[in-house]
Amino acid sequence: MQGRLSAWLVKHGLVHRSLGFDYQGIETLQIKPEDWHSIAVISYVYGYNYLRSQCAYDVAPGGLLASVYHLTRIQYGVDQPEEICIKVFTPRKNPRIPSVFWIWKSADFQERESYDMLGISYDNHPRLKRILMPESWIGWPLRKDYIAPNFYEIQDAH
C-alpha cells in the first residue's frame, strides 16, 4: 500500500522505497542520499512545510547510519495534519547526506547533533560543528562500535 506522497513520487519517476506505515498511519519512505535534496525540495513544495524532528541512529555495528526526518503538512483549518517519515541511509565510511537547512531552518541544531553524535556530514550546512561534545572529542559516541575512552574521575578533596 502506498501513501499519497509515495504515489506522487512514483508517478513522477522519483526513486524511493516505501517502508510502509507506522502504528499511527504515518508513511515511511527510504531515500538514497543522492536523491534526498531534490525529494526534500519536492516535499516542501508539495506542502510539507514543517520539519517536526530530525534524528539519526546507527542501524547495526559496522552497518549503515540513518538520518530520519519527520515532516508535517501544516494547513489552516486542519486538525490532524498529514505527516511523513523519511529515512536516508548512508554508509558508515564517509557518511554524507545533503543538508536541508536551506529548506527547513529547524534542521540547524538537529543536523548538528546528528553530526556530533554519529559523524554524519550534512553537505552545505552553514555551521556544521560539534554542538554537545567538545571540539577536541575523538569519535562518535552514539555509534554502536564506539569505544569509550578511559576516564579517571578526580575525587573532591575534603
Curated annotation (Swiss-Prot):
GO cellular component, one term: chloroplast thylakoid membrane
Entry's transmembrane regions: none
Catalytic reaction equation(s): a plastoquinone + NADH + (n+1) H(+)(in) = a plastoquinol + NAD(+) + n H(+)(out); a plastoquinone + NADPH + (n+1) H(+)(in) = a plastoquinol + NADP(+) + n H(+)(out)
Keywords attached to this entry: Chloroplast, Membrane, NAD, NADP, Plastid, Plastoquinone, Quinone, Thylakoid, Translocase, Transport
Pfam family, one: Complex1_30kDa
Enzyme Commission code: 7.1.1.-
PROSITE patterns with a match to the protein in the record: COMPLEX1_30K
Residues in coiled coil: none
GO molecular function, one term: quinone binding
Location in or out of the cell: Plastid, Chloroplast thylakoid membrane
GO biological process: photosynthesis, light reaction
Enzyme class: translocase
Membrane topology of this protein: Peripheral membrane protein
Recorded family membership: Belongs to the complex I 30 kDa subunit family.
Role according to the record: NDH shuttles electrons from NAD(P)H:plastoquinone, via FMN and iron-sulfur (Fe-S) centers, to quinones in the photosynthetic chain and possibly in a chloroplast respiratory chain. The immediate electron acceptor for the enzyme in this species is believed to be plastoquinone. Couples the redox reaction to proton translocation, and thus conserves the redox energy in a proton gradient.
Complex and partners: NDH is composed of at least 16 different subunits, 5 of which are encoded in the nucleus.
Record-given protein name: NAD(P)H-quinone oxidoreductase subunit J, chloroplastic
